[in-house]
């Protein structure tokens, strides 16, 4: 920066880094929370997939419909979470390069 001494330049650069970090912090926190949520949902989906693959599971008339309903709910939630995850990923990438 012309007209700015080295110490002032370092101070301005540090301030810019701090502002950028403050801007990214909530996005990173939301991104991490969504990743955790996705992992939990994927684990639950895997468990339900195993249960639903067992023909004996359908002998209990009460559990099978509940499991099928929950599986469908998880699929819907995961679609939304992955979309949000992708949006946040794009926003973080753009914010990190500016």
What are these regions (language model features)?
Residues 1-98:
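Charged, heptad-repeat coiled-coil alpha-helices that serve as long linker/dimerization "arms"
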């Amino acid at each position: 920066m012309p007209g700015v001494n080295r110490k002032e330049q370092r101070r301005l650069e540090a301030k810019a880094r701090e502002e950028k970090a403050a801007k990214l912090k909530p996005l990173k926190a939301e991104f991490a929370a969504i990743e955790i949520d996705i992992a939990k949902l994927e684990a639950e989906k895997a468990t339900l997939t195993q249960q639903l693959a067992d023909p004996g599971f359908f002998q209990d008339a009460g559990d099978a419909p509940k499991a099928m309903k929950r599986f469908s709910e998880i699929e819907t939630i995961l679609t939304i979470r992955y979309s949000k995850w992708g949006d946040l990923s794009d926003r973080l990438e753009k914010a990190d390069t500016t």
